[in-house]
Amino acid sequence: MKPSHFTEKRFMKKVLGLFLVVVMLASVGVLPTSKVQAAGTTVTSMEYFSPADGPVISKSGVGKASYGFVMPKFNGGSATWNDVYSDVGVNVKVGNNWVDIDQAGGYIYNQNWGHWSDGGFNGYWFTLSATTEIQLYSKANGVKLEYQLVFQNINKTTITAMNPTQGPQITASFTGGAGFTYPTFNNDSAVTYEAVADDLKVYVKPVNSSSWIDIDNNAASGWIYDHNFGQFTDGGGGYWFNVTESINVKLESKTSSANLVYTITFNEPTRNSYVITPYEGTTFTADANGSIGIPLPKIDGGAPIAKELGNFVYQININGQWVDLSNSSQSKFAYSANGYNNMSDANQWGYWADYIYGLWFQPIQENMQIRIGYPLNGQAGGNIGNNFVNYTFIGNPNAPRPDVSDQEDISIGTPTDPAIAGMNLIWQDEFNGTTLDTSKWNYETGYYLNNDPATWGWGNAELQHYTNSTQNVYVQDGKLNIKAMNDSKSFPQDPNRYAQYSSGKINTKDKLSLKYGRVDFRAKLPTGDGVWPALWMLPKDSVYGTWAASGEIDVMEARGRLPGSVSGTIHFGGQWPVNQSSGGDYHFPEGQTFANDYHVYSVVWEEDNIKWYVDGKFFYKVTNQQWYSTAAPNNPNAPFDEPFYLIMNLAVGGNFDGGRTPNASDIPATMQVDYVRVYKEQ
């Protein structure tokens, strides 16, 4: 459960990006990069990586701006950052003198400067409010390379006029993707979005409606930021939308009558028949990773749209018989909704979207025959007849398949007996008393991080304030209850902002911390829109910097509206916004949910890997080859080599589920915890 911040989505990635490629790369551990290993080479020369990476980099912003550049080419390109990092220092010019950045004053690693690592590249980032000169130097040889980071302050202003730079008539793709760059404000191209952002509102309506919808933090309307609309940064930035019907988008000034209306047209095709034909080719060869991507067939000569996807039938030929791909026991394929899961050795498949829709498959090691069918009447379950397109897959026998030898299920204790063979119980709370045991737990209270008004809702836009009241946190009948209630309250940090709900959050900081081991929570979770129960861990000391450079382990998080699944995640990398995460989902067997019974949520944390389980069943693993901390590039286990403490809470709203808010019937909501147990191996 992270202290999240505003996340920008790139329009090209969201709408036109190579979604399949990104999924495939991420699935095989390419994103993010492996951590830096031990170094020993000294720097004999440095040159700028590209013209965009120095010597002069100019940025503008309201009060401050963020800069980043790729590491220079070391030793004529023969040495990498991994080789030379221990020999590279950073100076800042103070007056006319070069001063080590750690001695210059005002520069705090992982707060306003640091390292980044992404996609095989490394570099530096800085957040600055004035033009600054930076010098990289070799500690051994005195080689230097200088950068000038030029800052131009943007003064906030209000909007008097807007003119489109794209549109205002825009046609959405077959998948519903569309977008436009920010307009020209006040008839002056020098007036940026940042200068007027506080004065700008966004409204949406169907083209055949007269009622505008304010989509700012209004998940109840169905418009959820970073889900079906958002902002991108490429080309100066703008807005993106995913639509299923034609809509109008209105940008409007809060302080004047200036507004601009766009029309995004979604052309739903007219089908004269439902005969399908190949989109492009019918023979596909697996790549080095064993992955294959195919576009879905055309229907009556046109690409399918979202509402038609459920009508398709996908089959594989097994020993001369056609078997539904979804019948995993016969097809030997597992559907993966979130991209390739490199913790599973199963053949996997799923959908991708990149202007059109398609399917991905991985790892394909053998040749096989696939066919896709569509009902002749266009209705799900209708007669298909011979309306199939047949595909030939040429497998790659050398494609990697994950090793799952250490992914066996684990034994769990019973509600009355914590004993587990091979494990020592080192801490527990069975909640058998009548009140919360404050020798084991602390209350967290309030609505803001560090009393900063900008961090309302705990930095996540959550809607609850936390209390130490027994109406929100109480022990009854051998269970801990954390209860969210309708209980509006404002705080001195911003008297005009109200937290609509109260709830509970407790932790073991300074009372229990562990470095490696196993944690079991047995809990029953609440359902409801915007209800967000979590069991998680944070570092006792932020040795590697503020979130997420020092790490976070989410044992379990759940979305109340989706009672059939929970997730486990780690957060790592650098301080926001260069943080990274890796996680997986557990799907309950048919007939079970996280709300209809108690389930045991476990994390097993070892020096070089972390694994997640539900009721003893393995569902996800991450290794130290996938995590890192930019503050300790030569430490293979950072940041997960420091003590962490436990946290339990029940949040409402927030960014985890796209800003969704509860219905009236969803509150009160209660998370019940039967026990928390901490083990070490014998």
UniProtKB/Swiss-Prot annotation:
GO cellular component, one term: extracellular region
Highest taxon of source: Bacteria
One Gene Ontology biological process: cell wall organization
Subcellular location, record wording: Secreted
SUPFAM superfamilies documented for this protein: Concanavalin A-like lectins/glucanases
Recorded GO MF terms: glucan endo-1,3-beta-D-glucosidase activity
PROSITE patterns referenced in this protein's UniProt entry, alphabetically: GH16_1, GH16_2
Residue ranges annotated for the GH16 domain, each copy included: 391-682
Keywords: Cell wall biogenesis/degradation, Glycosidase, Hydrolase, Secreted, Signal
Active site, per annotation: E552 (nucleophile), E557 (proton donor)
Coiled-coil regions, chain positions: none
A Pfam family: Glyco_hydro_16
Protein function: Lysis of cellular walls containing beta-1,3-glucans. Implicated in the defense against fungal pathogens.
The family this protein is said to belong to: Belongs to the glycosyl hydrolase 16 family.
Protein name, as recorded: Glucan endo-1,3-beta-glucosidase A1
Organism field: Niallia circulans (Bacillus circulans)
Gene, per the UniProt record: glcA
